[in-house]
Amino acid sequence: MQYGFARSSEKSFKLDPSVTDPEFHGFWTWPCTMFNVPPGSNFMTVIYEFPVDAETTLQHYDIYFTNEELTQDQKDLIEWYRNVFRPEDLNLVESVQRGLKSRGYRGQGRIMTDKQRSGISEHGIAYFQHLVAQYHQ
């Protein structure tokens, strides 16, 4: 599980002001599926990532809303995921993936972890990358 704290943004995710605990949760299942649940939202995302080779990852996003008819805010959020978040996220995934083949890789790569396993730490991502590296050895 990965978690962090969400902040409202006019450009992306708008956090409901009534939410008192803005904690974001991400759950992943080996080898390539992640479920993300933003705080106080009426949607979740499911992300599938398929490493093709050392430089390429195929990525597929699904966004599930609780309502059938999308609001304008929801349509705007979908566009933000498509045009901003996904390209940034995919670039990060592929840069870590390339780092796994470098001679300087020492089990952590370009991922931030801390001993306290705090909410800003990326232990889940580091563990996932470790599993990918083991699988491809």
Question: What residue spans do the PLM features occupy?
Answer:
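C-terminal catalytic domain of Rieske-type non-heme iron oxygenases
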Residues: 1-137
